[in-house]
């Protein structure tokens, strides 16, 4: 049985032993942080080193294999210099969805503004809207049905950030966001949990309409 606390303790200890003072940061992300994980969920860990090489990746992979649950291991590792040059648009999302385990993440990120957060939402909104419309036109009905709920899961992060911009409150957990979000957002959040045999036309129209309204909402924030 998987024990998250033991796994994190083992991972931190092994990384400290392998990288020493070069280990600047470790953080937990994803479904285990949100309390939404199941037995086979990815274990998302973020790692920042002072200097980063291919050899460091080999070492980190070896550590992950040695402590177990390698197939579930996931996340991101990079160097301090790369992190300082990271896209400003992603800074808010990173800070709000990462729990510090070793070090403080904000110390290694570039500065970001509210405008950056708005542009992050606009970019994400446009990408997902394009994906939705492109697939509707260029893919068959079966593929549209199969992938629709996956797109709805990605919309969670959009609504999470849009709600933050509109209310000032970043809500990490899906269940809590459903309770706090506007009715139109709540309806879309529930689309990801539709059962097999759902009414695709009705669900697609709901999501398509939500996207169009979301573009107008983000414009009002500027």
List each language-model region with its residue ranges.
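Catalytic metal-binding acidic patch
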Residues: 30-61, 74-77
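Conserved nucleotidyltransferase catalytic core and NTase-mimicking acidic/glycine-rich helix/loop elements
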Residues: 111-222
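Soluble or luminal CAZymes and related metallo-dependent hydrolases
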Residues: 3, 7, 56, 206
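A generic fold-level signal
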Residues: 21, 38-40, 86
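Hydrophobic, Leu/Ile/Phe/Ala-enriched alpha-helical segments that form helix-helix packing faces
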Residues: 11-19, 61-68, 218
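Conserved NTP/Mg2+-binding pocket subregion across the NTase superfamily
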Residues: 3, 57-150
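Helical scaffold of the NTase/Pol beta-like nucleotidyltransferase catalytic core
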Residues: 1-27, 181
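Short, flexible, glycine/charge-rich loop motifs used to bind or transfer phosphoryl groups or to couple energy/partner
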Residues: 16-17, 34-36, 144
């Amino acid at each position: 049985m998987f024990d998250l606390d033991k796994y994190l303790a083992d991972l931190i200890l092994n990384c400290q032993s392998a990288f020493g003072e070069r280990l600047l940061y470790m953080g937990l992300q994803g479904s285990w942080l949100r309390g939404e994980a199941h037995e086979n969920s990815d274990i998302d860990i973020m790692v920042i080193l002072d200097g980063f090489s291919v050899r460091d990746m080999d070492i980190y992979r070896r550590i992950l294999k040695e402590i177990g649950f390698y197939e579930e291991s996931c996340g991101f590792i990079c160097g301090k210099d790369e992190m300082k040059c990271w896209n400003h648009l992603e800074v808010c999302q990173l800070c709000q969805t990462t729990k510090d385990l070793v070090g403080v993440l904000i110390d290694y990120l570039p500065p970001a503004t509210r405008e950056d957060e708005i542009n992050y939402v606009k970019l994400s909104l446009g990408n997902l809207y394009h994906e939705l419309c492109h697939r509707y036109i260029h893919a068959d009905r079966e593929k549209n049905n199969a992938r629709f709920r996956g797109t709805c899961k990605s919309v969670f992060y959009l609504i999470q950030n849009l709600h933050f911009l509109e209310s000032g409150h970043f809500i990490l957990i899906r269940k809590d966001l459903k309770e706090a979000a506007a009715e139109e957002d709540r309806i879309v959040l529930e689309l990801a949990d539709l059962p097999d045999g759902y009414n695709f036309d009705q669900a697609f129209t709901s999501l398509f309409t939500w996207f169009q309204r979301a573009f107008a909402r983000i414009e009002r924030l500027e």
